Amino acid sequence: MSAHDLKLEEIVNAETLRRKLNELADTADESYTSLPMRKVVLQTLKDALASGRANAEDMLMKDGGGTLCAKRLCYLMDTLIDILFEFATTRAYPTRNPSKAENMALVAVGGYGRGGLAQGSDIDLLFLLPYKQTPWGEQVVEYTLYMLWDMGLKVGHSTRNIDECIRLAREDMTIRTALLDARFLTGDKDLFRTLEIRFEEEIVKGTEPEFIQAKLAERDARHRKAGETRYLVEPNVKEGKGGQRDLHTLFWITKYFYRVKTKEELVKLGVLSRAELKLFNKAEDFLWAVRCHMHFATLKAEERLSFDIQPEIAQRLGYTAHPGQNYVERFIKHYFLVAKDVGDLTRIICAALEEQQAKHVPGFNRIFLTFSRRKRKLSDDGAFISENHRINIARPDIFRQDPVNMIRLFHLADRHGLEFHPEAMQSLTRSLKLINADLRENPEANRLFLEILTSPRNPELILRRMNESGVLGKFIPDFGKIVAMMQFNMYHHYTVDEHLLRCIAVLSEIEHGELKTEHPLSNHLITTIKRDRNLLYVTLLLHDIAKGRPEDHSIAGARIARRLCPRFGLTPSETETVEWLVREHLTMSMVAQSRDLNDRKTIIDFADTVQTMERLKLLLILTVCDIKAVGPGIWNGWKGQLLRTLFYETELVLTGGFSELSRAARDKQAREALAERLSDWPKEERDAYLALPYTNYFLTVSLDDQVRHAHFIRDADQQGRALVTMAKPHAFEAVTEITVLAPDHPRLLSVITGACAAAGGNIVDAQIFTTSDGRALDTILISREFDTDDDERRQAERVGKVIEDVLSGKAHLPDMLAKRTKPKKAARAFKVEPRVEINNTLSNKFTVIEVEGLDRPGLLSELTGLISDLSLDIASAHITTFGEKVIDSFYVTDLVGHKISNATRQGNIKRKLLALLGAENGARTNGRSPQAAA
């Protein structure tokens, strides 16, 4: 890369800047170290820094060159430090007859030493001395550092002589790595050269295994800390898996092992092909571009590509929307594909290190496994061998001779429980062009693949290796389209392909009984569907395979399943089941979380969709795996309880156990059952209480809860309390129930939900009942926050106290909400198009109003308040949150208990709710339906 390409003269003109400082010094009356002179020098350097950075940003916006930008910013810093150091040693603290000790080399180390910087990067400097520090040296170092700090730079520094550098490099791997990147800046070049020679002879030589082992272990620890997958949707560009640090690690170990100065030398040595070198350079350039843009956009050393800055970075890089994917999603997909390329390069270089050079370095193989070179054949044709507990190819041409071997490699690894030899993976990666239409339709290849996918061992591990190598996306091109695809929202934590692999991992854990405490129903059901277990694995691999297309991914995915399943060897009946499961994979979750499961029509409609117990079982397990694999914290006990309730209620319909008794008959039975449980009450008091609740209460609430409510209301009446709350933790369901007894009025639920929001409670469900004497008995469920019931009860009682204070007028709700209405920073990056649907077919008794919008503190209170203002009674509310998006369903009637059937009134309700949802919101960028986005 030439200076002409870099256009360095547009960044800073070194001679002009040097001349300007000298002219200032020549005309100054003060001492060069005086405060006025120091201010002048500082301002001159700061102006040059600001101008150079601005020019670098402008050039980045024009040419898009990430590596160019990093080198330009590094040149800017080199120039400023060189001129500053010259001023310090010739003007501020000159030496007329310097001794040998009054000498110094200024050296860039660490990231700065590698020759690339982003705007906010640390500037790591080594003040290299020939002997011990001198008073002159202390003055120069102090002057230089304070000027750099006052320029606003983050400077890391050390002052050492050569002996100290060598001793510390021997003891500390971090210091050794920093010196490996050492680059001369200014001062005594011979001194620096002496350090280089001694570092090579005394530190590097003979310690290659030690260094490489340490760097790979350091990388693994960093990945564990940042997140094992390279597909986290808010990646750390510098430290994350597949990020810049991984590229640095690769170059460190090759530089240390092969004694190279540039990546180009690795091609001459046969470590990388020219295509792989090009891949390395492209990955490096892209990551530098992203990181430089992040620093420029945020005006700080921002390394995490968080949701709130992703749109701006995507725009800066020039991404545009395509059908089915917005510009942010296209950018992040490109990012993850680059991260995957970095993983490929890691495997290639590790293979070269182990196989090409290990024999030259005693003990090198200990880095990877053991000295043992025992080999055994794994296949009759001798194509594969087991070597050090890893599968390897016996000959370099086995994939070309029989492309089915590209699938057989993974099948054998699974069957024998082997890791993969780097040489085999390198050969595989370089043979991907062999995967063509003939191989995809090959019956043996598909038989082997289905056995891998449905393996009773650990299918996720092998599929992950297939995906990382590129084989999975080539063998199933539809899968290849969703590799590295992200969805720009706060709900999905992983890319689509990563989510699918994690779904398969969850299913395998359920099948092995590892999740029986958390998922008892799924754990039981999996043992009853042995004949259909393969269908679940196939469905989980395919259920989101059509994401990123303009149409509903469930419908498009079902078509893909219909095409692929016969190829995998499934029968027509099995194909039909998988196709149905893919098409309906969101249905059970949607019904469980956003519909009233106490409403009989909800259950009957869902049973009509499912039709058979076999499908119900498969759909329940599929839904559990799908939700649990979305990301940490998405699954909770409340969702599990909703799914179990829906399963059991639907099972009754499908098996003929669902009672068709009239409402009146069921109401009579329920009152009689409660009367029996309250038999110790005086008859007059018992009869009076049984007359309080309306029919809907008895048909909805469990008998145990009815008994608890009866004692709750009785105690309140005996104490003369019109307003009272009660808390009950439900540990397994991960919710806490707060029951509120209060005089009924139209906006009561709005006040309760608002008070709950003000107290920090996250409402997931609400049931609203009134009594015949004009009171309301409302039950809200809030997400569990604590591990122990005692802590959770105290928190719930605090929320209940806030509710009581607000309802009694002791606290002012608007003031309390105002303190919590600022949305989360990440949520501000998103737009969710407001949506309101009014449906009279989902319930026989109620109109269902479903609203969707951008979540914000207090939104539920605003919605319920507006619904009350529109003269509607809310019977139940069901709250579902998908990251930044909320979908709330309200079961309502008018004030006389009728559905809302008038079209004009429906239009007015919809218009006002849309206006409320639209406040502080805009049009959603992806334009997907709520189901499609889930």
Swiss-Prot record:
Residues 1-379 are annotated as: Uridylyltransferase. Residues 496-613 form the HD domain. GO terms for molecular function: [protein-PII] uridylyltransferase activity; phosphoric diester hydrolase activity. Its EC number is 2.7.7.59, 3.1.4.-. It catalyses: [protein-PII]-L-tyrosine + UTP = [protein-PII]-uridylyl-L-tyrosine + diphosphate; [protein-PII]-uridylyl-L-tyrosine + H2O = [protein-PII]-L-tyrosine + UMP + H(+). InterPro entries: ACT-like_dom_sf, ACT_dom, HD/PDEase_dom, HD_domain, NT_sf, PII_UdlTrfase/GS_AdlTrfase, UTase/UR. Pfam families: ACT (PF01842), GlnD_UR_UTase (PF08335), HD (PF01966). Residues 737-818, 848-931 form the ACT domain. Belongs to the GlnD family. NCBIfam families: PRK05092.1, UTase_glnD. Has four distinct domains: an N-terminal nucleotidyltransferase (NT) domain responsible for UTase activity, a central HD domain that encodes UR activity, and two C-terminal ACT domains that seem to have a role in glutamine sensing. This is Bifunctional uridylyltransferase/uridylyl-removing enzyme. The lineage of its organism: Bacteria, Pseudomonadati, Pseudomonadota, Alphaproteobacteria, Hyphomicrobiales.
